Structure formats: C-alpha cells, structure tokens
Amino acid sequence: MDYLDLGPYSSASGTVRLPGSKSISNRVLLLAALAEGETTITNLLDSDDTRVMLDALGKLGVKLARDGDTCVVTGTRGAFTAKTADLFLGNAGTAVRPLTAALAVNGGDYRVHGVPRMHERPIGDLVDGLRQIGAQIDYELNEGYPPLRIKPATISVDAPIRVRGDVSSQFLTALLMTLPLVKAKDGRTVVEVDGELISKPYIDITIRLMARFGVTVERDGWQRFVVPAGVRYKSPGRIMVEGDASSASYFLAAGALGGGPLRVEGVGRASIQGDVGFANALMQMGANVTMGDDWIDVRGIGHDHGKLEPIDMDFNLIPDAAMTIAVAALFANGTSTLRNIASWRVKETDRIAAMATELRKVGAIVEEGPDYLVVTPPEKLTPNAAIDTYDDHRMAMCFSLVSLGGVPVRINDPKCVGKTFPDYFDRFAALAKA
C-alpha cells in the first residue's frame, strides 16, 4: 500500500492560494453546459470529481475547451445533443445527483454509475422527486442506489414536488438546477422540503449560481422554493470559481496549531460558501483569526496555555469542515462534542465510524453516536500512528494535522486527495516546519 510519512513538525506559516471550490466548479460546469451562449470559467478545480463531470458533459455532446484552470463551455440551450450515453461518475456526488436530474428531463437513454462506494450512497429521495414529474428511472442493482437507467419520459409538472432534505442537500440542488428546463402550467414550479434541510449553505450556493445564469429562485424559509418554469439559463460570459472553503480548513487549523502567521487566499468575508464558517468555529476554540474579502489569516492560539479550548457545537451547516474540528480537538484542553453530523455516514465513507477509529489510534478517547462525536484528547499524542483513509480525501487531509503535534504520522493511500486537492501534501509540506 502507498503511504506518506509526515512530521514531526513544530510550526506552520506562510501563504497558500486555494484550488477552486469543488461544489462551485461542478455546479458552474453543468449550468454553463445547459445555458445559452459561451461561458469562460476561470480557477476551475482540476481534480477527480471535476474530471468525471467534464468527461460526462463531453459524452453528452457539450463542446469544451480547457487550458490550465480555464475552461470555455459552449452551452446547449437546455438540451444535451447526445440521446444515449454510459456515464461513469466516480465517487462524485456533485456530479451524479445534478446530472441525474438533468438527464431525466432530456428525453434520452442513459446509464449513470460510479465506483463501488457511489453505489452505496443514497439517491432514492432524488429519484422519488423526479418520478413525481414523470421521469422514468430504474435501479440496476439495489433499490434507492446507483447504478441508474434513465429512459425517455413525458415530463409534466402539475403539483408541488416534495423532496426529503434530511439525508443530502444535493437532492434539492439537483431539482432546483433542472426545473427551469421543464414547462409548467402557471410558469413556475414549487418544491417543498420534507423534514429539516441539512447543509443549507450548499443550497444557498446553488441559488446564487443559478442567479448568475439568469434564473431567480424564490424561497420561503428553507421549506418551500419557487422556480421559474420553461426558461433558459443565459451565460454570464465569464465566471470565476472562488477557492475551496472546505480545503481552506486544513490550512487555517495548521495556522492555529503551528503558530502561524498563515494566510489562506481565495476565500474570505465575500465567499458564497458556508464552510468559511469554519473560521468562526476555530475562533471559538481560541485561535487568532482575521478575515478580508478573499483571504483569512491565522496567528496561533490566543491563550497563555497554548492549547485550543474544547468546543460543543452543532455542525449541521458545515459538515465537511467539521471533520477538521474533530482532529483539531486533539489539541484542546478538554472534551469536544460535534453534534448533528448524521450526513457524515453517507459521504465518501462512513465518516463518523472512520473518524472515531483513527482518532483512537493517536490516543484520543472517542464516543461515537448516530449523529454525534465526542472527542477527549490524550495527554500526549501517540507517535507513528498509521492512519487509514478509507478512499476519503478529507480523512487524509484532516489527519495530516496530527504531525503538528510534534509526532510523526503515517497517512495510508495519500493519493485519495486527488478527489478535490491533488497537490495537497506538497502544499502542506511547504508550510510545515520541523
């Protein structure tokens, strides 16, 4: 097995420019593909998840021209030209869910599948929502999970569409992005959310990006959304992808644990991503954080004792960045509790189980619940722990921070970071000092 040994490091400082946001990159690619006109996308993330989206769009007949982190997309005016396609989408939820919805109303024969883990990640709530408007979608293996077979269908909207919001916000995102393509009797479609909507900031990203492409979604709280029906997305001409706020969390934590000063460029006060809220959680734990419109600085910890304060917080809004808090909790002077993180169980791996297992390897006492994690740090971190990463990019990046505790750590299968941040470990090593 491939592995990477890190540390021991005693400090971290410098400046890092973030790669483009995964969530924004894949949304913008699909919107540009469906729009009227040509869109130039800059700072597009180059990673496994964006590559599978680009490959799929190419197979669907979308004209794409890539040059470094810039991509010029020629829109299809709302309908893909390829009416049959077999689409492999890896483990990219940001590609599988929105593309499934767009294909369901495109009048073609499609197969959507991915890696084995993708076939364990639920999609039934989205399929149920699409079937309400007449979509013909069949499960190839297990009910409620990919692979999917999508067939031509007569699509019509007669009543509000209901979708569950408590498993993944990507189901709602997929519906919102697709519904403008569908005609409705009174020129609008209503989507109603059953249960509490999780990861609300990701829906905010979707609505803001749709607006950039000329389609305005009205919402009543987070339970009812009104989407214009039978309209065309219009290219904004140029659009820049902001830095990935989830990826920022590792460097911000490094600036706290390693003393800093460490500056992250590409996200800040003006960001449309909810995961910039990670900086506020870090401040609650005692880190010295300052923020500009598109940068965040961290300069160590503001306590004389030099340790973070423990935290007890609801992380429903920022589940991805919350993983970094779980590892930062190793450096606190007491027990931390991460609440409302049930969505971790259906991500790239069961992140609650994986995080509990690996935190114990470095000496933590961990209590694992259905939707919470309680982390009590050890007196001293266990050196030379071999961290398993479960083919989950965020597990690998989170546990790199252990090396800032003055102990070496081994990361197994480090290449899994290719999903969102292929050169993460090079960037981390450039900032960490022995």
From Swiss-Prot:
Q: Where does the protein end up?
A: Cytoplasm
Chief localization: cytoplasm
- Please tell me which top-level EC class this enzyme sits in: transferase
| Domain of life of the organism encoding this protein | Bacteria
The record ties this protein, via SUPFAM superfamilies, to: EPT/RTPC-like
Active site: which residues? 320
This enzyme's EC code(s): 2.5.1.19
User: Which residues does the record give as 3-phosphoshikimate binding sites?
Assistant: 22-23, 27, 168-170, 199, 320, 347
One GO CC annotation: cytoplasm
Q: Does the keyword Ligase apply?
A: no
Ligand binding (phosphoenolpyruvate): 22, 93, 121, 170, 351, 394, 419
Q: Which UniProt keywords apply?
A: Amino-acid biosynthesis, Aromatic amino acid biosynthesis, Cytoplasm, Transferase
Q: Catalytic activity, per the record?
A: 3-phosphoshikimate + phosphoenolpyruvate = 5-O-(1-carboxyvinyl)-3-phosphoshikimate + phosphate
List the GO molecular function terms: 3-phosphoshikimate 1-carboxyvinyltransferase activity
Look up the record and name the pathway of this protein: Metabolic intermediate biosynthesis; chorismate biosynthesis; chorismate from D-erythrose 4-phosphate and phosphoenolpyruvate: step 6/7
GO-annotated biological processes = amino acid biosynthetic process; aromatic amino acid family biosynthetic process; chorismate biosynthetic process
Q: Which InterPro entries match?
A: Enolpyruvate_Tfrase_dom, Enolpyruvate_Tfrase_sf, EPSP_synthase, EPSP_synthase_CS, RNA3'P_cycl/enolpyr_Trfase_a/b
Family named by the database record: Belongs to the EPSP synthase family.
Q: Which PANTHER family match?
A: AROM/DEHYDROQUINATE SYNTHASE, PENTAFUNCTIONAL AROM POLYPEPTIDE
The record's note on quaternary structure and interaction partners says: Monomer.
Described function: Catalyzes the transfer of the enolpyruvyl moiety of phosphoenolpyruvate (PEP) to the 5-hydroxyl of shikimate-3-phosphate (S3P) to produce enolpyruvyl shikimate-3-phosphate and inorganic phosphate.
Q: Identify this protein by name.
A: 3-phosphoshikimate 1-carboxyvinyltransferase
Q: What is the originating organism of this protein? A: Burkholderia orbicola (strain MC0-3)
